[in-house]
């Protein structure tokens, strides 16, 4: 664990989240928002303990995530919220499987087993044309549509899954300068549309963009 910088009310650390959270005081976090590595889809490191290197979503990745959620439920304060960004994961041909892994459902089930309360999830729609070009998914491409429509499917959305830690929230979050009523009308929509979200406006977008990325 490495402390990168800090202020009077915050600290920024760099380290492996699972062993690092084990060192953190209980009930020391006010809010957690994160996106877990998607198993077998993106490789971030060569480490065996990296969730992204898990080949089997239903066993290996499930075990990794269970350690994570148990520590997360311990360090977040009672009554506070946790928001997780996830998506469903296509099964790879190399595994001999077809269809989708229910990664959204897996995170919900593991979170509940760790003691968290599953409260809600927002759906974030995706541009099907952009996703077809980026992923080269035959289920989305026009070629697949014109070859055999039985195999066609829609674009895969993202999800924002909201958990809450059991207990009473000691400090009420009610500042009127953070979220206006008009903002809340938009944010409370069950599905956020891709036309209103700038998907490429992310951290390190220039450094992380490939030559064929749109």
Question: How would you name each of these model-derived features?
Answer:
Residues 1-214:
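Core catalytic lobe of class I
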């Amino acid at each position: 664990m490495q402390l990168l910088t800090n202020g009077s009310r915050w600290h920024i650390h760099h380290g492996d989240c699972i062993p690092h959270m084990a060192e953190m005081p209980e009930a020391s976090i006010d809010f957690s928002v994160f996106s877990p590595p998607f198993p077998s889809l993106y490789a971030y490191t060569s480490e065996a303990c990296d969730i992204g290197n898990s080949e089997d979503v239903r066993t290996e990745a499930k075990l990794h995530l269970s350690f994570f959620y148990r520590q997360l439920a311990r360090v977040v304060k009672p009554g506070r919220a946790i928001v997780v960004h996830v998506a469903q994961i296509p099964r790879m041909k190399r595994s001999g499987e077809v269809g989708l892994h229910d990664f959204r459902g897996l995170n919900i089930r593991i979170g509940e087993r760790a003691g968290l309360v599953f409260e809600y999830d927002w759906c974030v729609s995706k541009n099907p044309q952009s996703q077809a070009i980026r992923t080269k998914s035959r289920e989305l491409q026009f070629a697949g549509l014109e070859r055999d429509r039985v195999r066609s499917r829609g674009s895969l959305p993202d999800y924002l899954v909201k958990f809450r830690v059991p207990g009473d929230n000691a400090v009420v979050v009610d500042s009127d300068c953070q979220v206006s009523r008009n903002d809340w009308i938009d944010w409370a929509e069950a599905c956020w549309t891709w036309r209103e979200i700038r998907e490429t406006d992310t951290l390190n977008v220039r450094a992380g963009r490939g030559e064929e990325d749109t």
